[in-house]
Curated annotation (Swiss-Prot):
GO terms for molecular function: lactate racemase activity; metal ion binding. NCBIfam families: Ni_dep_LarA (NF033504). The active site is at H108, H174. This is Lactate racemase. The lineage of its organism: Bacteria, Bacillati, Bacillota, Clostridia, Thermoanaerobacterales. Its cofactor is Ni(II)-pyridinium-3,5-bisthiocarboxylate mononucleotide. Belongs to the lactate racemase family. It catalyses: (S)-lactate = (R)-lactate. Homodimer. InterPro entries: LarA-like, LarA-like_C, LarA-like_N, LarA_C, Ni_dep_LarA. Its EC number is 5.1.2.1. Catalyzes the interconversion between the D- and L-isomers of lactate. Was originally shown to use Ni(2+) as a cofactor, but in fact, the cofactor is a (SCS)Ni complex, a nicotinic acid mononucleotide derivative that is covalently attached to Lys-184 and forms a tridentate pincer complex that coordinates nickel through one metal-carbon and two metal-sulfur bonds.
Amino acid sequence: MANIEIPYGKSKLAFDLPDERIQGILRSKAGSYKVNMSEEDIVKRALENPIGTKRLQDLAEGKKNIVIITSDHTRPVPSRITLPLLLDEIRKKNKSANVKILIATGFHRGTTLQEMKAKFGEDLVENEQFVVHDSRNSENMELIGTLPSGGKLEINKLAVEADLLVAEGFIEPHFFAGFSGGRKSILPGIASVQCILANHCSEFIKNPYARTGVLENNPIHRDMIYAAKKANLAFILNVVIDSSHKIVNAFAGHSEKAHLKGCEFVSEIATVNAKPADIVITSNGGYPLDQNIYQSVKGMTAGEAACKDGGVIIIAAECADGHGGEGFYRWFKESKDPQDVMNKILSRGRDETLPDQWEAQILARILINHKVIMVTDSKNYEYVKDMFMTPAKDLGEALKIAESIVNNDSKINVIPDGVSVIVREK
């Protein structure tokens, strides 16, 4: 008997599985990756040895208006560690620079003051200049080019007006951009809603290269790279974290070169080989990534990659924030089945993309080929049902439901943290 723990909200769900039922337990190697350095020292080492560019302190010398793009409340970037070190590096040769910290919300809701203090610490919030990006506020946007896809590249004016643009973030597998981090700080991070919608169109989401761990020929990534170049993103600090959100590696320097090095590292530790199973049990990595159903689609894509067609995906996600997007929810609430959702989305052109359409498209793709059971807070049960999934109170109940759909002795793949792995079929 194997005891399995799955991240769920700010805690974990534990359950036992007979050894003979387990086809594979698929984990990123990040959890076992050993570093004999403190998190601070890992970041300092990266800042002192930038990839493809000068040190940040040298780039900052003589600059008057510096903007640091950081991640919002939905991302587990350990900014309490990284931001002070970035600020210190900038101020080593430029104590008088005006530094603004721009929170990249992308298409998410704005980060609240309470969430800012929880993420960055009260001292930092009270003593530094923070600005929350609002993709819907057209007055704060500036047109700086046309994306390879044809969409208008509009980003926050603060970034355009900066004489040095820096970004921090983290690199993990991403379910349609290939990997997070790097260029994503610009698009979707600080882009306008119209720009984000064009980049996330149904044509691109459908593209077979718009998948986890894939950058080459990925049209979404191609747009993002262009956006970072046009925005003059001069320096990045991207970290890699384990399942406890501890820093295990860091990459700093040129926005594309440093990011690619980081992606290579993540690919090495995150790629798992799986034989598809009838049942897959996974999660969205716990808080803050499982705050809503919308975000939890990411974890489901790992389940999709490790599950047979017609199989069952069980995802544990607390979803304290509910469905996470009215537009996303309505795609399902107002459709007769997942195929109906997909047909409606694919009928929309590149310039007709609606808010949250991409997440609905990916969830519909999963639901067309698999049953999904969601272990979540009971307040979400109606949402889950409306979205053609089945709610369950715990993993035991979820497994019983799954076994009523497939055989009782079906093999099971377990992916404790679905957002941390790149699943490749054996």
